[in-house]
């Protein structure tokens, strides 16, 4: 069992008796809590710095900074629950924190999954609009639209997390006196639970990733048509977002695979204890890999974002925002020529210069 456990009440005897040792390995109970604790410390520090830098220095004036701010907040809300999961795993999957915290900590996982993937999708669409359709997109690529989009993302992610709020609860195995935090459901709800698990695979990963992949493919094609020197001016934020997306993919794909295997177990397609053990052992490991996404994002911002590095150094040197130099995201002098060329190449060049002046927030 793990923090992704499911318990079908009509099937407890099979789980508790026939496959009672699945996933119960000493190295899991030692290594996983250490990893969770490390992610907690690094994630809280890193994402807190991102929130402070963007809010205090960058003032959330651009579309990208608003999305990145919400991404950091999502990661921060999630990583603060990791000490609970670390203790839960260290105690051999025994949950002593009560039903309320079981629901809250579980909901934070699902909420983080959906908000992260939706925000990354919006970032890729924003980059696509800014680079491929720079003139037309200026109408809707505003801070207000970005804020409303983020509100919508949080609402949709919260609705997608409702099964955790409703079905996640503590369950006592009387024969072992073990209290677990798991999704508990009647056999009549099996197809609903399977549907929710598949939604994580399809809505929470596959569809958004296809949108992201398409967006960046079209962006790459467009960038080939402009001058290399001009492209370099837009590389900072482009490289950073691509890195964030790739990190998300490689961190979450193992978890998505094991979630699908868990669906097959729930549907009785897989019916042997060896596979139960593989899934129950692999699930906390893949969850750890997925959780690394929440603590590594801030370091990507610092590595790829020149302005972010500058503001971060100002922060750790205790330089107040009002005293900082004013070479900020909106103060670069425009290089746009006074007249537009009739050719497509010149039009794109000018548009990208304008975009860089407005959007170079990193």
Curated annotation (Swiss-Prot):
Q: What are the TM regions of this chain, as residue ranges? A: 27-56, 63-90, 100-126, 143-166, 192-217, 239-267, 278-303
Q: Which residues are angiotensin II-binding?
A: 168, 185, 200
Q: In which tissues is it expressed?
A: Expressed in lung, liver, kidney, and spleen, with highest expression in the heart.
Sorted alphabetically, which Gene3D superfamilies does this protein's record hold?
Answer: Rhodopsin 7-helix transmembrane proteins
Q: In the record, which residues receive a covalent lipid, type S-palmitoyl cysteine? A: 361
> How is the protein altered post-translationally, as described in the entry?
C-terminal Ser or Thr residues may be phosphorylated.
What residue ranges lie in the Cytoplasmic compartment? 57-62, 127-142, 218-238, 304-362
Which cysteines share a disulfide bond? Answer: 19-273, 102-181
Extracellular compartment ranges equal 1-26, 91-99, 167-191, 268-277
Q: Does the keyword Phosphoprotein apply?
A: yes
* Glycosylation site positions: 3, 18, 177
Task: Write down the membrane topology.
Answer: Multi-pass membrane protein
Q: Which GO terms describe its cellular component?
A: external side of plasma membrane; plasma membrane
Query: Which BP terms does GO give this entry?
Result: calcium-mediated signaling; immune response; neutrophil chemotaxis; phospholipase C-activating angiotensin-activated signaling pathway; positive regulation of cytosolic calcium ion concentration; regulation of vasoconstriction
Q: Name one GO molecular function term.
A: angiotensin type II receptor activity
Name the protein family: Belongs to the G-protein coupled receptor 1 family.
Q: What does this protein do?
A: Receptor for angiotensin II, a vasoconstricting peptide, which acts as a key regulator of blood pressure and sodium retention by the kidney. The activated receptor in turn couples to G-alpha proteins G(q) (GNAQ, GNA11, GNA14 or GNA15) and thus activates phospholipase C and increases the cytosolic Ca(2+) concentrations, which in turn triggers cellular responses such as stimulation of protein kinase C.
- The name under which this protein is listed is Type-1 angiotensin II receptor A
Q: In the UniProt record, what gene is named as encoding this protein?
A: agtr1-a
